[in-house]
Amino acid sequence: MDEFHRYGKEDSSWQQCFLYPLFFQEDLYAISHDHYLDGSSSSEPMEHLSSNDQFSFLTVKRLIGQIRQQNHSIVLFVNCDPNPLVDRKKSSYSESVLEGLTLVLEVPFSIRSKYSVEGMNEWKSFRSIHSIFPFLEDKFPHSNYVSDTRIPYSIHPEILVRTFRRWIGDAPSLHPLRSILYEYRNSSESLQRSIIVVPKVNTRFFLFLWNNYVYECESILVSLLKRSSHSRSLSHGSFPQRTHFHRKIKNIFLFSRRNSFQSIWSLKDPNIHYVRYGERSIIAIKGTHLLVKKYRYYLPIFRQCYFHLWNEPYRVCSHQLSKNCSSSLGYFLRVRMKPLLVKTKMLDELFIADLITDEFDPIVPIVPIIGLLSREKFCDISGRPISKLSWTSLTDDDILDRFDRIWRNLFHYYSGSFGRDGLYRIKYILSLSCAKTLACKHKSTIRVVRKELGPELFKKSFSKERELDSPPFSSKAAARSQRERIWHSDIPQINPLAHSWQKIQDLKIENLFDQ
């Protein structure tokens, strides 16, 4: 593998390298077999992992050679033997073949992505979920058009093969990939045989397919983002439109006099901002009405033609977002644009002007959150807390940990809002629901539970909340923090409530297209 990396770096035509002979390297399947054992050791019983089970690389080679045949490739996904030992051995060969195929395809993909990133050094992009919050504060309110696009998990097998065919010149190496994808589609229980439903399992093969597909989807926007990045520091047209521009003065881009005309011309291009999390992406465009209208019309058509989606164009769902509300990371955020008066003063007080601009003022959406809590049986439709009966079989620590995790994620996400009265109402609902759940489990009352547990209820969240609300700064900085908005984007994992809300939104979109 290291030699292949070195040859690919020295030779510019590394895309034409022959990948098919790599499928027959024993070292490759030794690595993939070790990966499979490491991944299955935590879930398989120890008696099933005895040393008597011999793994034959010759069998794997024969399976690779016969993979084009219908009766051999289907064994990769269908195991009919109920015996767990035989079933595990079949799965071992299947997983090794998939792991080996993934390792071979990852080599040219890693080289390709490395060269692509090195060629985009001038494009200062933020590749973290923490960049979503600055995007909502700085870019979202000042954009003319904001669209929410959902990339489907259901992808036709031929589309995946064609994405690899664009940058891999060795066509025989893609025949096993095509056979595996089509056999998986035929062996699945889905009624829609024209697509492949990528399962939400943590397998390296399907994760690699999904990452490669998303990489291709984002590649069509790279040239547009690179072009708009030259005027990113002046994206709003004037500094007063930034609330705290004195903190961002170091990011000012000074144009030279020689390139002044070219820089002014680049400011006429629309500023495009792109954010993606999972299968959802947000594109914000700022520019003239005519340019925004053209981008709204041509971007979906170009995406469909680029990925050969003209047979099912509805699978890429895109709709315009309202500036009064937005959704990211599976959460829902209500926005209020508040007018802000900004005074600008030149040197020696030669010129003083008052400018009125809009400020991003997020609000905690009480009604949608209460509705979501009622669907998950934490409260009724009016917001009265009830016990979570499905959790009464858990231990006390598990119940407290689950409620603590839900509240901590909600608090961290909505901590950037000015008005927190609604957020503390949500905390009251969750804390009382937790107390009722414990009381129902022990067949006691809430008063007895509170007396026994005391400060243990949401102890982690309360301590974290005090730490966030009272930072160890000076008195002047602490007073300023009371007036300013602070985003605490410490979200270790997505809230289960966010998944439930996202499923409801996706179901509404699918029902809309089915009508």
Swiss-Prot record:
Source domain of life: Eukaryota
**Secretion signal, residue range per the UniProt entry:** none
Cell compartment(s), UniProt = Plastid, Chloroplast
Task: Set out the biological process GO terms recorded for this chain's protein.
Answer: mRNA processing; RNA splicing; tRNA processing
Family, according to the entry, reads as follows: Belongs to the intron maturase 2 family. MatK subfamily.
Which InterPro entries does the record match to this protein?
Domain_X, Maturase_MatK, Maturase_MatK_N
* Keywords annotated in UniProt: Chloroplast, mRNA processing, Plastid, RNA-binding, tRNA processing
Please list the coiled coil stretches: none
One GO MF term, please?
A: RNA binding
Give the function comment from the record.
Usually encoded in the trnK tRNA gene intron. Probably assists in splicing its own and other chloroplast group II introns.
This chain's protein is named Maturase K
Q: Does the keyword Secreted apply?
A: no
**GO annotations of cellular component type:** chloroplast
Would I find Transmembrane helix among this entry's keywords?
Answer: no
Question: Pfam families attached here?
Answer: Intron_maturas2, MatK_N
